[in-house]
Amino acid sequence: MPLNAVARRSRASSSDAPPGPKRDAILRAAIDTFAERGYFNAQVADVARAAGVAAGTVYLYFKSKDDLLVSIFERSMREGLAGSRAAIADLPDPPERLRRLARGHLARLGSDRNLAIVFQVELRQSTKFMERFSSTLLRDYLGLIRQAIADGQREGLFRADLNPTSTAKMLFGALDEMATNWILSRRKYSLEADADAVVDLFLNGAQAR
C-alpha cells in the first residue's frame, strides 16, 4: 500500500490499535530496524524479531510496515510538539523562546541516534509521505517558531521586513541540517550544543537595527 494512502488512514489505524508496552516495544524495534537496515530493505519479520514477538503480533497493532513508519512519525512529532509547548509556556521573551525551541529540537534528536536517522533519512525517501504531513504536524511545529518571530517583530526586536513563515522555515532548515550533519559525521559530539550557535547566528541577522 502506498505511503500516502497509509498516511490518510493512519489516524484510524493507530487509534484502533490497543496501546501498551507491547505496542511501544514494537515501535522501538521498528525505529532501530529501519535505522540499521534502511526502511525499504527492512521487513516486518525483522521488526518482530527485534521486538521479541511473532510477526503476526505486529499486525495486531499496525496494518503494515508503512503504518509503522507513519506511527513513528506521528508519535514522535506529537511528543516533540508537547515538549516544545511546555518548554516555552512561561517564556514571554521571543529570542529566548527561539533558543529554547532550538535546544529542544536538537536535544530530542541527539538523544536517540536511530530515531534521528529515521527522521532525517528514511522518512524523506518518500516525497508523497512528506507532502502529506508537511501541512499538519510539521506545520504546527513550525507555527511555534513563526509565532515567536512574529511576537519579536511586534515588540521591535526583529526586523519588520522579515516574513515570519519563511523565516521560521529558515531556522528550522538550519537546525535540520545540523541534525543531518551529526548523523553523517564520524566525530562524536553533542548535537544540542550546536543549538546556541545556530540561534545566535539567526538572531544577529534578524535583529532590528
Describe the residue ranges of each PLM region.
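N-terminal intrinsically disordered/low-complexity leader segments
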Residues: 1-21, 28, 32, 209
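Hydrophobic/aromatic residues within well-ordered alpha-helical segments
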Residues: 22, 65, 72, 76, ...
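Helix-turn-helix
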Residues: 25, 33-67, 71
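Short hydrophobic clusters on alpha-helical segments that form packing/core surfaces
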Residues: 26, 30-34, 105, 175, ...
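Hydrophobic alpha-helical connector segments
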Residues: 71, 85-114, 164, 168-171
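Amphipathic alpha-helical packing segments from all-alpha helical-bundle domains
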Residues: 78-82, 129-155, 165-169, 173, ...
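Amphipathic alpha-helical segments used for helix-helix packing
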Residues: 97, 109-129, 181-184
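Amphipathic C-terminal alpha-helical segment
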Residues: 107-111, 147, 151, 171-189, ...
